[in-house]
């Protein structure tokens, strides 16, 4: 086994979000398309009210408050991270913790955004079969209606009725969703949620198996 090679072109690549250095073999970078603004946190300030609002929606506020400010910012950015890709014909489906973007890739060098659908819940991994799109949801800000408002903090658990009895958990939010969403994408520019299958702990990712 050999160690790192300083002459490897990858060893001197410059960092960057959109302008990082590149080194490739057998593949060519054709195009860069940034995420739509709705899928970006839009702040580098951990004390920004928007950042704190997102943190409250996706995590335990009392716990995340103990984390360093830089870590808090990274956690908030995760709520807008891209996840899995799915392909069908000339369409690319990009899952994102905050929803879904659909692209026309008929000409890869001129890839264009067709549809953006805000639907928080993470991880939002996607699979496509015929006219149906399946999306995994596991985070605390997932709602049946794809809303962005999240939920108020859960009330404290009820006091135990008897000695040594565990306190009852707070009631579940009726609009919260964790599981697998199913969308009809017959109209590729207007996906419609046609089913939402709740699971015990939500769905981090999934595998689509057909007959």
PLM segments and residue spans:
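Feature marking well-ordered beta-strand scaffolds used for ligand recognition
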Residues: 1-211
């Amino acid at each position: 086994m050999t160690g790192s090679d300083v002459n490897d072109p990858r060893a001197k690549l410059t960092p960057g979000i959109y302008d990082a250095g590149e080194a490739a073999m057998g593949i060519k970078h054709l195009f860069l398309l940034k995420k739509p603004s709705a899928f970006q946190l839009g702040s580098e300030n951990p004390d920004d009210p928007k950042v704190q609002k997102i943190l409250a929606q996706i995590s335990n506020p009392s716990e995340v408050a103990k984390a360093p400010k830089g870590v808090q910012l990274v956690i908030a950015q995760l709520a807008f991270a891209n996840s899995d890709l799915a392909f069908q014909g000339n369409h690319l489906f990009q899952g994102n913790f905050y929803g879904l973007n659909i692209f026309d890739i008929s000409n890869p060098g001129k890839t264009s955004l067709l549809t953006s659908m805000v639907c928080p819940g993470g991880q939002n991994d996607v699979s496509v079969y015929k006219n149906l799109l399946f999306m995994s949801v596991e985070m605390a800000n997932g709602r049946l209606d794809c809303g962005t408002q999240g939920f108020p903090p859960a009330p404290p658990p009820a006091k135990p009725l008897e000695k040594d009895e565990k306190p009852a958990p707070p009631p579940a939010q009726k609009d919260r969703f964790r599981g697998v969403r199913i969308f009809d994408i017959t109209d590729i520019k207007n996906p419609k949620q046609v089913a939402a299958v709740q699971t015990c702990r939500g769905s981090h990712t999934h595998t689509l198996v057909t007959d």
